[in-house]
Amino acid sequence: MLFHITHTHTPETCPYHDPEKAKATFGKVMSGAEQLGVKLVGAWVDAPAHTVYIVVDTDSVQKIEALLAPAFEIGHAETRPVSDAAAVIQRVTG
């Protein structure tokens, strides 16, 4: 199942100018997906807005919680299940 994650943080907690914080937060998120059984479909950042967008494929919300745990202290995340738009259109239109 696909999930779209939006993580936001403040300028004060931003890891952009702190390489150690970057490794300890999003570095661990990006490198830990496979070990947790989560497929990282893609990740994008809007640095000026302090927002990270991640799409994952997994069968468990608990795996998403474990994946995001390194970034919990610097901000918050919203997780939404999503579907492939082309597949939905095909299903609806036959």
Regions found by a protein language model. Give the residues of each.
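Short S/T/G/P-rich N-terminal loop/turn motif that feeds into the first structured element of a domain
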Residues: 1-35, 39-41, 45-50, 62, ...
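Short hydrophobic/aromatic beta-strand micro-patches
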Residues: 8, 55-57
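A short local loop/turn or secondary-structure capping micro-motif enriched for an aromatic residue
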Residues: 13-14, 73-75
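Juxtamembrane helix-loop transition sites at the ends of transmembrane segments
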Residues: 27, 58, 78-81
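Short active-site oxyanion
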Residues: 51-53, 76
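Conserved catalytic core of Hanks-type protein kinase domains
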Residues: 57-58, 70
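Short amphipathic alpha-helices in soluble, non-transmembrane regions
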Residues: 64-72
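Conserved short beta-strand edge segments in small beta-sheet-based binding/regulatory domains
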Residues: 74-86
